[in-house]
């Protein structure tokens, strides 16, 4: 009986490694070093920590496992999982632990093989986007238009138009709408 317990615990550890190894969120965190220079070691530590969590707590519920995984991801990788995949990972771990406890080694080994085939090759690519000169100028114009307000009795918009020169002054007068808003039209180039 003790040999079977050790064997099922080793099998569950292997199953945990397969589940976490096929989880894209953890793979992205490791590949991009979200956990620092020791990201791979932290992922391996998670396997042992989850194995220990299951063996030291009887009758874990899926939400408890999910909370534990979320805590590990947040603490070790500074990652908050928002895609809902942690629920699937927790469910798989609970099912595999139950199967290991009941001695269903063939089913667990089949799941491990399935997860090994399904392992994702996920790499997040970071692209730097530099706006062109035209885009920078147009965004500056938009900011200028947003900075000034034209309220009745206020001369700040008129003084701003005069300070910018006649070429930048709007040709049409701003028209107040029925609901009290003022429509500001963008100048054309």
Curated annotation (Swiss-Prot):
Transmembrane annotation, as ranges: none
Extent of Low complexity compositional bias: 152-169
Cited Pfam families: WGG
Acidic residues bias: start-end ranges: 131-147
InterPro entries assigned to the protein according to its UniProt record, in alphabetical order: Pre-rRNA_process_TSR2
Alphabetical keyword list: rRNA processing
GO biological process: maturation of SSU-rRNA from tricistronic rRNA transcript (SSU-rRNA, 5.8S rRNA, LSU-rRNA)
Protein's job: May be involved in 20S pre-rRNA processing.
Name by which UniProt lists this protein: Pre-rRNA-processing protein TSR2 homolog
Segments for region (Disordered): 126-189
Gene Ontology annotations for the cellular component aspect, listed alphabetically: nucleus
Family that this chain belongs to: Belongs to the TSR2 family.
């Amino acid at each position: 009986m003790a040999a079977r317990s050790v064997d099922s615990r080793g099998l569950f550890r292997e199953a945990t490694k397969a589940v976490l190894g096929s989880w894209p969120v953890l793979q992205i965190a490791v590949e991009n070093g979200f956990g620092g220079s020791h990201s791979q070691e932290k992922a391996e530590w998670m396997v042992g920590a989850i194995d220990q969590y299951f063996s030291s707590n009887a009758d874990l519920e899926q939400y408890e496992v999910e909370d534990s995984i979320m805590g590990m991801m947040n603490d070790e990788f500074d990652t908050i999982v928002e895609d809902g995949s942690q629920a699937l990972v927790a469910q798989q771990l609970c099912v595999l632990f139950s199967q290991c406890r009941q001695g269903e080694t063939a089913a667990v080994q089949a799941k491990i093989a399935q997860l090994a085939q399904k392992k994702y090759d996920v790499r997040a690519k970071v692209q730097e986007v530099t706006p062109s000169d035209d885009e920078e100028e147009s965004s500056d114009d938009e900011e200028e238009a947003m900075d000034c307000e034209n309220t009745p009795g206020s001369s700040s918009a008129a003084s701003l138009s005069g300070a910018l020169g006649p070429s930048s002054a709007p040709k049409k007068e701003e028209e107040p709408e029925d609901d009290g808003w003022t429509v500001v039209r963008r100048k054309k180039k």
